[in-house]
Amino acid sequence: MGSEMCIRDRYFIAAKLLREAGEGPSIIVSPLLALMRNQVEAAARAGIRAATINSANMTQWEEIQADVDKLDLLLISPERLNAPGFREEVLPQLARSVGMLVVDEAHCISDWGHDFRPDYRRISLLIDDLPANTPVLATTATANDRVVADVVAQLGEGTGVLRGGLDRESLSLNVVRLADPTQRAAWIAQYLAQVEGSGIIYCLTVAACLLYTSDAAD
């Protein structure tokens, strides 16, 4: 989480600086709706104008597309990016003026990756349509050597690779043994009251998700 936030903050800053230099909005390709919402909220807190186009806000697409020149960042799912209507009607205008292209969760490009998304493979077609010297950044925290090589091959010749270490002081793994769902819900509620920021709670069932969501809201 800490590493991801550092990367995100850097391309937020880069997008803002590019806009101030007269470039167009930056495009971030992201595979997860929750992640896109989180990034839009984080951008707003940083004073950066951002919006997202995905399957959860279809009624807002036309409004967002009409006002795209007013944005610093546009977050979009790979499936929407490759939809015929979007590619033919919206993408050409964006490609002509895009400040930067960011491919988030770039391991999804590789069919060797654990979370392969076919539409990510088509991002290379978008890169071919971008003006020369348009910055392209691909980020991931889960790529082995084979996946990195595949991503580089998809992005094109001249792609540079920067890799950080795997020992991250900001991450820890703990196991807490609790007897039943009631105790787990109580522990989560107590823990949430002690920490700041955002996070994700993974559950095995929809019922558990609803239970913990209700407790967290209270």
Regions found by a protein language model. Give the residues of each.
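A short hydrophobic beta-strand->loop->alpha-helix junction that borders the nucleotide-binding pocket
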Residues: 29-33, 53-57, 166
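Single, functionally critical "micro-switch" positions that shape active/binding sites
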Residues: 30, 76, 217
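Short, small-residue-biased leader/transition segments that mark boundaries at the very start
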Residues: 1-7, 215-218
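Helicase motor core with emphasis on the C-terminal RecA-like subdomain
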Residues: 8, 16-19, 37-51, 60-78, ...
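Acidic/His- and Gly-rich active-site-bordering loop/insert found
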Residues: 23
